[in-house]
């Protein structure tokens, strides 16, 4: 399901995933993979792992690269999103992020109407109940795949059979668990030298209790390789911060569209350029990250775009200034992944004048890839304007066009029969009917091709200072027209209108 790069890109960059990723515990990656390693070892050798082997696997998983853990968490969150009913996804995100009181989150049932089970690793033969996965992911509780009967739904849960809300799921503590907890607390109290507190009433605390360590060791055998302190520490560490060196919190905040710090809305996402997954994210382009559709047909617009960097999840779900775009249309855009050889003008345009598309090419070319990019918190585009052209994947805000809005850019108001190119003049210039072309629609051709000639008008066209001339009536230029009388659409690299006209060439 996730073997194709397209599917990976769509799933890993969904706003649903980016909002929940900071709340996933790093322990979940270690725990799920450790269980899979132990199971694989037992099937291969027909015996259980030794303590030393299991401890080595645990240390290896704990020291895994952060981008690997985040990629795994993104895939798992994508699976969970598809198993949650579309009408419950927004409430689920808001409740996990603390923006809304927890409510029931219903999952899609299996064929028998019960809780579904999913595999949490690629090509894994073990399946886990959805509610078990939720508790491990967002609470960091070390549960086995057979511990589904230990889960208890809260009293306020109205759908205990299909609800996967972590705040509605608790773990039943048996007498054996309480008994073991007593010995753990006693041992911690002895090691720290502090008196034991909170074990009962004051009268019970005043009585001396002797701890028979020998009897405890004879009755119980520790099967795990986590110590109490280590288990609590790793189970409380988020997957986005439970990492080694070269992965600071600032980079993580820049990577996430939903920042850990709500006030820092100007940070853009970055990833270390040394990781393979990071290069894939840059290479895959940023346009398929911004928008995705749910099975119900709803569009989600990523707040990583400049127009929505200051909007919350609810505004993204309701829709804002930037209209959603299909990925098939985005891939046609020549600005999807600019190469390092792009001109400075193109780079500056893609970083400052794209209304919907978030660009990562600047990050890849940055001399300091480990530092997060800072952008102004205010939106580049006017927040009140909504007159984008809806006919194509790339929409331009009104402030990029100093002239009047284009009437119909995609059809050009031309009859197909009248779009046949005219004869070539002596200089090899191609003549086009002036009723099909205007200075606002024309743009410089790609390098290596002759420039299009703009036929002069029969009447002198009025020209505003800094604006482009527009012919008033159709006419043709004879082949012997002198070069001084020919008008060409050629703009200097510093002309601000050149940026806009360079775009219209790709929309033709």
From Swiss-Prot:
Modification N-acetylmethionine, positions: 1
In-chain residues carrying the UniProt-annotated modification Phosphotyrosine: 300
Region described as Disordered: 190-209, 267-348, 438-495
Extent of motif 9aaTAD: 404-412
GO cellular component: a single term: fibrillar center
Sequence similarity: Belongs to the CTF/NF-I family.
Role according to the record: Recognizes and binds the palindromic sequence 5'-TTGGCNNNNNGCCAA-3' present in viral and cellular promoters and in the origin of replication of adenovirus type 2. These proteins are individually capable of activating transcription and replication.
Protein name as annotated: Nuclear factor 1 C-type
């Amino acid at each position: 399901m996730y073997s194709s790069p397209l599917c990976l890109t769509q799933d890993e960059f969904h706003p649903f995933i980016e909002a929940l990723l900071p709340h996933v515990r790093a322990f979940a990656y270690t725990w799920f993979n450790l269980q899979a390693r132990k199971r694989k070892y037992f099937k291969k050798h027909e015996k259980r792992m030794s303590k030393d082997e299991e401890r080595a696997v645990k240390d290896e998983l704990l020291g895994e690269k952060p981008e690997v853990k985040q990629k795994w968490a993104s895939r798992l969150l994508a699976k969970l999103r598809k198993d949650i009913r579309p009408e419950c996804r927004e409430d689920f995100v808001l409740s996990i992020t603390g923006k809304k009181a927890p409510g029931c989150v219903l999952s899609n049932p299996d064929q028998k109407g019960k809780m579904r089970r999913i595999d949490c690793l690629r090509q894994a033969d073990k399946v886990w109940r959805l509610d078990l996965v939720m508790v491990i992911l967002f609470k960091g509780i070390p549960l086995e795949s057979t511990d589904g009967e230990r889960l208890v739904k809260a009293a306020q849960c109205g759908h205990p059979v299909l609800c996967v809300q972590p705040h509605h799921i608790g773990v039943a503590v048996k007498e054996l668990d309480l008994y073991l907890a007593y010995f753990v607390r006693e041992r911690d109290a002895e090691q720290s030298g502090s008196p034991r507190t909170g074990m009962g009433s004051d009268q019970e605390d005043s009585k001396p209790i002797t701890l028979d360590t020998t009897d405890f060791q004879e009755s119980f055998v520790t099967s795990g390789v986590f110590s109490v302190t280590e288990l609590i520490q790793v189970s409380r560490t988020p997957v986005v911060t439970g990492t080694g060196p070269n992965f600071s919190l600032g980079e993580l905040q820049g990577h996430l569209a939903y920042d850990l710090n709500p006030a820092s809305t100007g940070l853009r996402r970055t990833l270390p350029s040394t990781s393979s997954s990071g290069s894939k994210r840059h290479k895959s382009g940023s346009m398929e990250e911004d928008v995705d559709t749910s099975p119900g047909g709803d569009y989600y617009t990523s707040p990583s775009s400049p127009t929505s960097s200051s909007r919350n999840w609810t505004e993204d779900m309701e829709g804002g200034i930037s209209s959603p775009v299909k990925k098939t249309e985005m891939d046609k855009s020549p600005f999807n992944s600019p190469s390092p050889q792009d001109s400075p003008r193109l780079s500056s345009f893609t970083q400052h004048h794209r209304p919907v598309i978030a660009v990562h090419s600047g990050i890849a070319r940055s001399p300091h890839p480990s530092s997060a990019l800072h952008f102004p918190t205010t939106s580049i585009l006017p927040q009140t304007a909504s007159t984008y052209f809806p006919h194509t994947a790339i929409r331009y805000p009104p402030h990029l066009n100093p002239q009047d809005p284009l009437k119909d850019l995609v059809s050009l108001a031309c009859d197909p029969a009248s779009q046949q190119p005219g004869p070539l003049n002596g200089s090899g210039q191609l003549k086009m009917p002036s009723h099909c072309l205007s200075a606002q629609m024309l743009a410089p051709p790609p390098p290596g091709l002759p420039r299009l000639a703009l036929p002069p008008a029969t009447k002198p066209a009025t020209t505003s200072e800094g604006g482009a001339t527009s012919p008033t009536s159709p006419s043709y230029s004879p082949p012997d027209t002198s070069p001084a009388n020919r008008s060409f659409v050629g703009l200097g690299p510093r002309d601000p209108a050149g940026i806009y006209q360079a775009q219209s060439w790709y929309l033709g």
